[in-house]
A protein has these predicted regions:
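A charged, aromatic-enriched C-terminal amphipathic alpha-helix characteristic of glycosyltransferases
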Residues: 4, 304-314, 320-346
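Glycosyltransferase donor-sugar binding loop
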Residues: 196-213, 232
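Donor nucleotide-sugar binding/catalytic pocket of nucleotide-sugar-dependent glycosyltransferases
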Residues: 103-152
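Conserved donor-binding/catalytic core segment of Leloir-type glycosyltransferases
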Residues: 155-176, 182-185, 189, 197-198
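Nucleotide-activated donor-binding/catalytic signature segment of Leloir-type glycosyltransferases, i.e.
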Residues: 211-233, 297-299
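Short alpha-helical donor nucleotide-sugar binding micro-motif in glycosyltransferases
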Residues: 101, 233, 240-246
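Acidic donor-binding loop of glycosyltransferase active sites
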Residues: 241-258
Length: 346
């Protein structure tokens, strides 16, 4: 499956096209795509330019979007930068993004917390005055049909044998505190709940030792038979096939839940309870009513920040006893909301 920001950009283009067909086009910038001539031609035919950060191969590709934004400003176009993260990025990565922040007329963010992170940056804090908030939709829509896989059959068999299957969807990196969920798994096992925790995703290689540290913690807790890491999953049909065999999802997050967590929204589409650390600030979802409704209806269960591993275990067990009759997930209108918010800045 495509990286999260790339998938977001493609879906944003499609959503804006639905609002005003023929108004927009896309330019993909990779190591092999997007020559200087391509960039000049594409930007030259536009009235405004929208760019999404962060990018995966930033060391090798960063000059291309920066060139596009610079050309756009020289042509007196409006430049909108969609910035998904800030403090969670490596400081060198943030440094390379500073020219984009300076060139942008408007910076779209999806979380008040991320905006506060930029505001307290000692170098770029003053740029936060350019920021506006938009509601983030999920990158992946639940398909009409799911796909089978050997891992799905393994999870199905585990549930049939009475195991409690706990899910964690998305890339695995330190910001998601993957090792904390291992501690929760150990608590549930000590209580006799016979858990099987499945991480549906793969490790991000940019983070040194994250996989080795994870595996060391698995061994330390003696969870070799209780933890599965799926690795890369090719399609949404296969992803949701795995989701169908999960009893509950769990995300212990040090920063707390933010409105930029698309992986949480993807998991919430399943109708399975999603247990996650509560937000750091009460205003986190004031701009995102659909996200707030998921919390109010119990699709997303908040655990107070600072809670111990036992509190997450308690929340998982309690969620299994609650009704899962949540309102239908209107994927198209989630994207319509985002497209309208960003189009208003063009």
């Amino acid at each position: 499956m495509q990286c999260g920001v790339g998938q977001f950009t493609r879906l944003l283009y499609e959503a804006i096209e639905k609002l005003d067909p023929g108004r927009s086009t896309t330019l993909t910038l990779t190591q092999s795509q997007g020559s200087v001539a391509d960039i000049r031609r594409a930007v030259g035919s536009a009235q405004s330019t929208v760019c999404s950060f962060p990018i995966v191969a930033w060391k090798r590709v960063i000059w291309r979007p920066l060139l596009a934004l610079a050309i756009a400003r020289l042509r007196r176009q409006r430049v909108v930068l969609v910035q998904h993260e800030w403090e969670s990025l490596h400081w060198l990565r943030r440094l390379t993004y500073l020219p984009a922040l300076l060139l942008a007329n408007t910076i779209v963010m999806f979380s008040p917390q991320v905006r506060r992170e930029l505001a307290r940056d000692p170098v770029a804090g003053w740029i936060a005055a350019k920021c506006v908030l938009a509601p983030l939709p999920p990158n992946i829509e639940a398909p009409s049909q799911t796909a089978d896989s050997p891992l799905r059959q393994r999870l199905k068999a585990a549930r049939e044998n009475g195991r409690l299957v706990i899910g964690h969807f998305g890339s695995i990196y330190p910001g998601k505190q993957p090792n904390t969920l291992l501690n929760v798994t150990a608590v549930l096992r000590a209580r006799g709940r016979n858990p099987l925790t499945v991480y549906i995703g793969s490790f991000i290689k940019a983070f040194d030792n994250v996989e080795a540290d994870f595996q060391a913690r698995v061994s330390e807790l003696n969870l070799l038979e209780d933890v599965i890491v799926s690795g890369y999953v090719d399609s949404s049909a296969e992803v949701f096939g795995l989701f169908g065999e999960v009893d509950a999802f769990c995300y212990p997050l040090e920063e707390g839940l933010t409105a930029r967590r698309a992986s949480i929204l993807t998991a919430a589409q399943t109708g399975r309870p999603v247990i996650v650390t509560g937000p750091a600030e009460a205003d986190e979802f004031d701009h995102h009513l659909r996200f707030k409704e998921l919390i109010e209806h119990g699709a997303i269960v908040l655990v107070p920040r600072g809670s111990d591993d036992s509190a997450y275990a308690d929340a998982i067990v309690a969620s299994l006893k609650q009704s899962t009759a949540y309102p239908p997930f209107d994927f198209e209108n989630w994207w319509k909301d985002a497209a309208e918010a960003i189009e208003a800045q063009l």
